[in-house]
């Protein structure tokens, strides 16, 4: 309430809602981001916060036991996605997925897919195949992004939001 009182002293912040959230930062060596754990709001002109509400949010790597605890089907689909890519492309290593669960449902998936770049034609072929696999395995996820990269160099981006009927595909020029 000390922070809220100080904010309310500012004329620009006197008559607007102010929202607070507590964020738990991940460990320094973690690949997944931290997460919001609770939130509260002070309505217009209020000097006290409403009740705090827990935020049921969790980030996990795919595949992993944490992801399987939240959505075993998604975890298995990601394994199959990787297996199919390894079967189709002899020089493919493995994709890394990060998923954000909200209320135990996958809300956002980000996949980093490393490739060895052999030319634009191969990038197009890989991107087409990955798009087919994404449609097959990630169709039930509202938002996903698959970043195809050669080292740090982006080669293609496949993304889909809940409003998209089909994934959006962008192949970067050399």
Give residue ranges: language-model regions:
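Terminal low-complexity, intrinsically disordered regions
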Residues: 1-55, 164-174
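A short acidic (Asp/Glu
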Residues: 30-34, 123, 157-158
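Hydrophobic, glycine-enriched assembly/anchoring segments
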Residues: 120, 141, 153-174
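A short amphipathic beta-strand at an alpha->beta junction
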Residues: 11-26, 137-159
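Short, non-transmembrane amphipathic alpha-helical segments
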Residues: 1-12, 121-142
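Charged, low-complexity helical/coil segments in non-catalytic cytosolic or luminal regions
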Residues: 44-89
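Short edge beta-strands and adjacent turn/loop segments
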Residues: 89-115
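Extracytoplasmic/periplasmic, Sec-exported soluble proteins
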Residues: 66-73, 77, 103, 115-122, ...
């Amino acid at each position: 309430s000390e922070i809220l009182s100080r904010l309310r002293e500012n004329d620009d912040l006197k008559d607007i809602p102010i929202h607070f959230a507590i964020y738990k930062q991940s460990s320094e060596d973690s690949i997944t981001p931290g997460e919001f754990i609770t939130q509260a709001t002070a309505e217009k002109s209020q000097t006290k916060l409403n009740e705090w509400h827990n935020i049921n949010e969790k980030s996990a790597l795919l595949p992993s036991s944490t992801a399987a605890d939240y959505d075993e089907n998604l975890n298995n689909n990601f394994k199959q996605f990787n297996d199919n890519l390894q079967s189709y492309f002899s020089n493919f290593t493995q994709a890394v997925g990060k998923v954000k669960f909200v209320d135990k449902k996958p809300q956002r998936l980000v996949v980093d897919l490393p490739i060895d770049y052999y030319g634009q034609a191969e990038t197009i072929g890989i991107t087409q195949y990955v798009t087919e696999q994404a449609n097959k395995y990630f169709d039930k996820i509202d938002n996903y992004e698959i970043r195809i990269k050669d080292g740090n160099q982006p080669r293609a981006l496949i993304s889909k939001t809940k409003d998209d009927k089909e994934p959006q595909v962008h192949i970067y020029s050399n």
